[in-house]
Amino acid sequence: MFRWRKGKCRGRKLRDIYISGLPAVRAMIPEPGTGKKPVAINLAEAEALRLVDYEEMSFDDAAAKMGVSKATVWRLVNAARKKMAKAVFEGRAILITKGGELERL
């Protein structure tokens, strides 16, 4: 279930995802503007991608730091990687958007 649907349907209450800090950059735009619709990555996906790929944490450590399960981190990282690849190979802009996550500083 997408996090933006929080509270709009029945089922288990979604847990909050802890973000260690806001990214310094909110968007990456290709040099020759293509005019295509940008790809939106939410803060949870960006945080999971940063922890696993940039800081080279294991999925277990990243899950503990974010306060979610290892499977959730795996889904977030895969979604972020797919969106990043789409943006790079189609020449789209990448936007980092908020999605209702808590911020732990």
Swiss-Prot record:
InterPro entries: RNA_pol_sigma_r3/r4-like, UPF0251, WH-like_DNA-bd_sf. Pfam families: DUF134. Coiled coil: none annotated. Gene3D superfamilies: Winged helix-like DNA-binding domain superfamily/Winged helix DNA-binding domain (1.10.10.10). It comes from the Archaea. HAMAP family: UPF0251 (MF_00674). Belongs to the UPF0251 family. This is UPF0251 protein AF_0666.
